[in-house]
């Protein structure tokens, strides 16, 4: 299976009443992608509450950052698994 460079573009979200950039919800996604052999790069965007996975310049997966489970390794997070499938199917 081909391994990809995955750019995770994420925007700020409200946590404890404060709008800020946080990667805690992205850790499980990162761990799952790395364990499958992909390289992962984070990039901040202005799109609030949004996460996009970009492979070869194309958006292959999009979700709200709150759809991802906080912390963990991503193995029990169904959204992380859908994202991994989308990356695996990318050209």
Swiss-Prot record:
Superkingdom per UniProt: Eukaryota
InterPro entries, per database record: UPF0728
Protein family per UniProt: Belongs to the UPF0728 family.
Protein known as: UPF0728 protein v1g117062
């Amino acid at each position: 299976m081909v391994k990809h460079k995955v750019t995770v573009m994420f925007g700020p979200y409200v946590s404890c009443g404060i709008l800020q950039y946080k990667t805690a919800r992205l850790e499980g996604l990162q761990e799952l992608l790395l364990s499958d052999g992909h390289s992962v790069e984070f990039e901040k965007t202005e799109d609030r509450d949004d996460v996009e996975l970009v492979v070869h310049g194309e958006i292959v997966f999009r979700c709200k950052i709150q759809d991802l489970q906080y912390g963990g390794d991503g193995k029990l997070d169904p959204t992380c698994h859908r994202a991994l499938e989308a990356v695996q199917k990318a050209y």
